[in-house]
Amino acid sequence: MSAPRIGVLALQGDVREHVRALREAGADAGEVRRAGELAELDGLVLPGGESTTIGRLLRVFDLLEPLRAAVAGGLPVFGSCAGMILLAQDVIDGRPGQPLIGGLDVVVRRNAFGRQVESFETDLVVDGVDGPAVHAVFIRAPWVEKAGDGVEVLARVADRPVAVRQGPLLATSFHPELTGDIRVHRLFVEIVRSELGLKRGRS
């Protein structure tokens, strides 16, 4: 099977780190900045950064509606930190009118673990990730305040969900691209491959 084509939204955040991790995990990965590139992708990563800034840039580059349509159409998407916020249905402590892509049936709390001075690292057991605990880096991170029935919680910190999955959508509060451990990215690549197999089976 050929490598799945996975784009990393290159407006802000740890774009190169995500691209490198995806390539190591077996994907044909590259940067994405234009709506027209979405149709060429088998999957997409929304990296961390500042969620309100990214939301504004999505409007500036006319990406918001195409991304909403892509998610609604079943494109597998992995959002880390700010990416989790963008995939949420609603945000607590967000800016008024903050643009969201949606698709993931969760309500998240922005900066739930505190501002940058209160960022931290910890080891997590993540369902679907084999081997030892995942070393997770949290930077002004959100958590999931409320999850719908169709959302699978993959990991928690202090009983708060920090990694979730709903069908082809995956989201983490933490930054797996910063540690050199590619297992979360490998999980997403496996999700993309599975969706490709289902799509081929339907065609």
From Swiss-Prot:
Highest taxon of source: Bacteria
Coiled coil segments of this chain: none
Presence of keyword Glycosyltransferase: no
Record's keyword annotation contains Lipid metabolism: no
GO CC terms, sorted: cytosol; glutaminase complex
UniProt keyword list: Glutamine amidotransferase, Hydrolase, Lyase, Pyridoxal phosphate
GO biological process, one term: glutamine catabolic process
Cystine bridges: none
Protein residues bound to L-glutamine: G49, E50, S51, R110, I139, R140
CDD domains reported in the protein's UniProt record: GATase1_PB (cd01749)
Reaction catalyzed: aldehydo-D-ribose 5-phosphate + D-glyceraldehyde 3-phosphate + L-glutamine = pyridoxal 5'-phosphate + L-glutamate + phosphate + 3 H2O + H(+); L-glutamine + H2O = L-glutamate + NH4(+)
Enzyme Commission designation: 4.3.3.6, 3.5.1.2
Function: Catalyzes the hydrolysis of glutamine to glutamate and ammonia as part of the biosynthesis of pyridoxal 5'-phosphate. The resulting ammonia molecule is channeled to the active site of PdxS.
NCBIfam families reported in the protein's UniProt record: PLP_synth_Pdx2
Subunit architecture: In the presence of PdxS, forms a dodecamer of heterodimers. Only shows activity in the heterodimer.
Protein name, as recorded: Pyridoxal 5'-phosphate synthase subunit PdxT
Lineage, opening ranks: Bacteria, Bacillati, Actinomycetota, Actinomycetes, Frankiales
Gene expressing this chain: pdxT
